[in-house]
Amino acid sequence: MAAEIHSRPQSSRPVLLSKIEGHQDAVTAALLIPKEDGVITASEDRTIRVWLKRDSGQYWPSIYHTMASPCSAMAYHHDSRRIFVGQDNGAVMEFHVSEDFNKMNFIKTYPAHQNRVSAIIFSLAAEWVISTGHDKCVSWMCTRSGNMLGRHFFSSWASCLQYDLDTQHAFVGDYSGQITLLKLEQNTCSVITTLKGHEGSIACLWWDPIQRLLFSGASDNSVIMWDIGGRKGRTLLLQGHHDRVQSLCYLQLTRQLVSCSADGGIAVWNMDVSREEAPQWLESDSCQKCEQPFFWNIKQMWDTKTLGLRQHHCRKCGQAVCGKCSSKRSSYPVMGFEFQVRVCDSCYDSIKDEDRTSLATFHEGKHNISHMSMDIARGLMVTCGTDRVVKIWDMTPVVGCSLATGFSPH
């Protein structure tokens, strides 16, 4: 069922502790059980499984429950030991797990959506279960009565969700690349604002209520940090992945962001440094360096008897430039560009060698990652994906210490 991996610890990379196999289809969610050597998984194979580590070091299923429909999302509340499972048919089901994690009792079904559930969050304080789905809506339901309290529709599939417990604000990412901030009330809601910055569908969100920062990952392979608390519209772009960003986790104590992408890439971003906002791209009818016309500028092409050029943009200054004036490439990590991007010649000359020092570390998960979650207190991470494999990682060599105690393993 599960193999215990004895990797030689290396100070610079995540250590693979265990690999769990046995699912018959893609694993859509995997969550570590706090203070236990256990993992809860939900899969397209219609099963919910609770895996506990045995004396042999291997993980074996102590609970194996088959659902009526493929499982598409999951939330777990440890203090009350409640599991909420979203399904492909739109229903959300609630279960209660026994104290020894050997038995799971069905509580109720919530008719939350008309189509696949994409994300679930449970608020114990409000007694709400909030969910998003491919029926283009966010719904919130009362866990006491099981009744629908409200729903709000979007123009495209709602793909991910975060919720601020104190203010009852929900953040919903969708397939159009937009993030909507909603204030949820008992039977209604109001749209506060929409955030636009990604060029692809939003795949994941992470909300840090302490610094009031929202992080989003998308199919444009990028992460954006939205400084909600600063109230100045400040955003930071982070580009280092080569595939769709699928999962995020912000470590507030160490100011590090962990992100995972579909190709198995694991990135750890240092957010405890002074970063710069990437500039808005400027528009011009001619190169802002050599003044040669771009190909749609027919009048200047005719007047100067020159061929029109393609428009490009310098990632550092945002100016519209031709290919000749932006022939060089450079990384610029302080602006979030961890790999080489197009810069104009004058910006290239202004970038010093120390400016190219990476502000992130990149690692290989060696499987397709569709979902990741962390037990931040223990520095553990679990990843899962379409290869049906669940991997448990020790992230303390990468993030520096055991986050709860400040104890360094080295």
Swiss-Prot record:
SMART domains: FYVE, WD40. InterPro entries: G-protein_beta_WD-40_rep, WD40/YVTN_repeat-like_dom_sf, WD40_repeat_CS, WD40_repeat_dom_sf, WD40_rpt, WDFY1/WDFY2, WDFY1_FYVE, Znf_FYVE. WD repeats lie at residues 22-61, 66-105, 112-150, 153-192, 197-236, 240-279, 364-403. Coiled coil: none annotated. The modification Phosphoserine is found at S408. Keywords: Endosome, Metal-binding, Phosphoprotein, Repeat, WD repeat, Zinc, Zinc-finger. The keyword Ribosomal protein does not apply. Gene3D superfamilies: YVTN repeat-like/Quinoprotein amine dehydrogenase, Zinc/RING finger domain, C3HC4 (zinc finger). CDD domains: FYVE_WDFY1. GO terms for biological process: positive regulation of toll-like receptor 3 signaling pathway; positive regulation of toll-like receptor 4 signaling pathway. SUPFAM superfamilies: FYVE/PHD zinc finger (SSF57903), WD40 repeat-like (SSF50978). The FYVE-type zinc finger domain mediates interactions with phosphatidylinositol 3-phosphate in membranes of early endosomes and penetrates bilayers. The FYVE domain insertion into PtdIns(3)P-enriched membranes is substantially increased in acidic conditions. The FYVE domain is required for its function in regulating TLR3 signaling. This is WD repeat and FYVE domain-containing protein 1. It comes from Mus musculus. The gene is Wdfy1.
